[in-house]
């Protein structure tokens, strides 16, 4: 359903106190009977910001952004007063050229651990920045006695710019690229029963939509089995987790329920793994 259609259905069923679960929508009107299963973008952003604040070893923070993400860069600057802002180079007409130079970043780095936020939806820019950062990560200066600059890359908004053909996953792994996500990737070595059954039936491993459909359906069924209804299950089963997704519903003061649980993950040896906190 589109958000408009979903809101219409939820509105019509609200008078019957019938719960309505949204599998993928985030910008919904939370009627009292609505369960928004997909975490909001704000929750994902908060997860990354809290991760940055919790790491006491971080000695320097850099925010790299393009013009479209100036508001996000300024928000991060308010969260981290020490943060240095680096923006895309611009043309004579003032338009983003979606690149930075080695010198742009090198001057902002410090010895020790540096956390670098990259905020963009442009794949070429993401490719340029990650390449430059990878070349500077733990670079040893034979003429200096200072420790090298360790770079950890993060973003508050994971999107297709970080997943395209121009992106070098080796660079992302070397930079320990961290981001928040609604779902983690299942480990094929875990011998998961659902994955095995799906593969046997369709001769292919399930994609994210298939896994999410299973996780969400299983969650609703188990909540109904273990509680009188979905509403009471929020207290009886405050956190549930399945193949790739977890659900921890909270109720808005005036409105329905939203999923308050997300994963923090990172690239490690060319795979995406959960960061245990």
Which residues does each predicted region cover?
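Periplasmic-binding protein-like
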Residues: 1-2, 21-23, 60-66, 111-129, ...
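Segments of small-molecule ligand-sensing domains
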Residues: 203-210, 221-276
